[in-house]
Amino acid sequence: MKRILSVILLLVLMLSLSACGEKSAEAAVTTDQGTDAEKAQGTNVTETTAMKEESAETEANAPAVYFTADISPSGLQKVYEALNWTPRGKLAVKVSTGEPPASNYLRAELIGPLVQSLDGTIVECNTAYGGSRSSSVMHRQVAEDHGFTSFAEFDLMDEDGETEWPVTGGKRIDKAIVGSHAENYSDWLILSHFKGHAMAGFGGAIKNVAIGMSSPSGKVYVHSAGTRTTGSIMHSDQDAWLEAMGEMVTAVRDHVGQEHIVYINVMNRLSVDCDCDGHPAEPDIHDIGILASTDPVALDQACCDLVYQAEGNKALLKRIERQDGLHTLEYAEQIGLGSRTYTLINVND
């Protein structure tokens, strides 16, 4: 009898130890994964003493992202000037003209003075879906109605066709298919409204180039991660199309030259919906500011980080995380498009 009791006690002890081990492993996994907010941050969340010296050196070499909370023509001018960049030739200013009737596109009164001072041309491409911007005639009317033609020339880059710029070493796509008029410009200001997006999670500098500079067939090509150039922009592999966006932007950077392109994001009217939506949801989050950089990855990462820190961010965070939006930045950094580590500089300090 004693022998039987001993065996039973031994089995109980073994089961207890096994359960304890499982809980420890579970805890280890939870700790390693971190919170969504931690994963969103471009810089390291935790740092050991041994890493501090290396981290300090990395941060010292990190690209600058310039910031102002002043969302006004003078604030926009100030962050632009902080870039210490001047176009050397004909300047294209890439914006989204916005889908009618009520999208949150950047207003003429905000961006007009800067664009005029630079003698820039507002450039866009037609869309690859229905709506008011799928044909040149309709799109030109939208540009006029939304005030873009009141302060600058307006160029639909795909109006006379398209051209291809190669992607070097792409996993998803091997070319960018852009409007043919893109060849007419030597310098580029990518002026983006940062906001949520139903398919990408968020839209900023990377999306404004990857989709905005693409011709309609180029848009389908990126959305389908290189599988087709006609048909629907709907896709089945979310990460693949996010990766295709990053690869498309490398083609643009390589073709025009990194020194010929800069990026500005305006963080106002932060709806969960893109400016391609004519009936966007009202924002729950307050306006944040204007940011500028020569690095599109650092710029979009800084904007995401500010969203994670902001009050009223629940709906926008849900949209970003539902679509795995941060993977765009992870992959873009991996392929050398830019850095998720950056130095944020307030131009008003």
Where are these predicted regions, by residue range?
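Positively charged n-region of N-terminal signal peptides that target proteins for export
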Residues: 1-9, 21-22, 303
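C-terminal motif of bacterial Sec signal peptides marking the signal peptidase cleavage site
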Residues: 15-19
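Short, low-complexity, disordered segments immediately C-terminal to signal peptides
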Residues: 21-46
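Post-signal-peptide N-terminal segment of Sec-exported extracytoplasmic proteins
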Residues: 42-58, 86
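Extended, low-polarity segments enriched in aliphatic/aromatic residues
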Residues: 57-113, 117-349
